[in-house]
Amino acid sequence: MQTNDPVFAGWDGSVIQARQLQQQLARRVVLDDAVSATPQLLAGFDVGFEDDGQTTRAAAVLLDAQTLLPLETHVARVPTSMPYVPGLLSFRELPALLRALALLSRTPDLVFIDGQGIAHPRRLGIAAHFGVVTGLPCIGIAKQRLAGSFAEPGPERGDHTPILLGGAQIGWALRSKPRCNPLIVSPGHCVSMQGALDWTLRTLRAYRLPEPTRLADRLASRRGEVTVPAACSGQLL
């Protein structure tokens, strides 16, 4: 598959070259906190599929950073360009995510993406790829481990253990809700390891997922709509 997308400039569509590109882009990931101490806007992104997988559906939710209430929601649809290949999720989903980002009326200060950050065999999951391409601070929130190993965290909400790969930490296993499997939390770009954990904890409510990706997941999976309060919708939509 050939692509003219500038996000994948020079990529010939092969798996081998995609992995090489990941290794190159991973060197551009920044693991220092660039998020304001008092951010105004957060965003959550998730991806689903329609038409038996032929259409990629990316959901974006913009939230107030203090109240975690949704301010606006958008869904972008693009033709699915490649099949699922383990470890190459961003090459399949990033075009739709960037389309959804462009629909937001304001730029978020911090982005949460359903998927891996640097907790990835080549340190470039979809949240890291998104962050490098956009320059936005990003955190990856994944439901399952893709790389590394960890000791099972304790049973209580907030219990966490480091995820290690080759002796280096690549993320956290976080018990976000009792009696639920831990989340895989990792920095994507312009967020530190500790910052990724702290921000995830700050955005948890009564659910397993933090609010930004929980709301985006509802839209992307078509399990429900996200209601924007009237006072907010008049301001931003």
UniProtKB/Swiss-Prot annotation:
Enzyme's top EC category: hydrolase
CDD domains xrefs: Endonuclease_V (cd06559)
Annotated positions binding Mg(2+): D46, D114
Catalytic activity: Endonucleolytic cleavage at apurinic or apyrimidinic sites to products with a 5'-phosphate
Keywords: Cytoplasm, DNA damage, DNA repair, Endonuclease, Hydrolase, Magnesium, Metal-binding, Nuclease
Cofactor(s) required for function per UniProt: Mg(2+)
Site (Interaction with target DNA): Y84
Location(s) in or outside the cell: Cytoplasm
Organism superkingdom: Bacteria
GO biological process assignments: DNA repair
Function: DNA repair enzyme involved in the repair of deaminated bases. Selectively cleaves double-stranded DNA at the second phosphodiester bond 3' to a deoxyinosine leaving behind the intact lesion on the nicked DNA.
Family, per entry: Belongs to the endonuclease V family.
Protein name: Endonuclease V
Gene: nfi
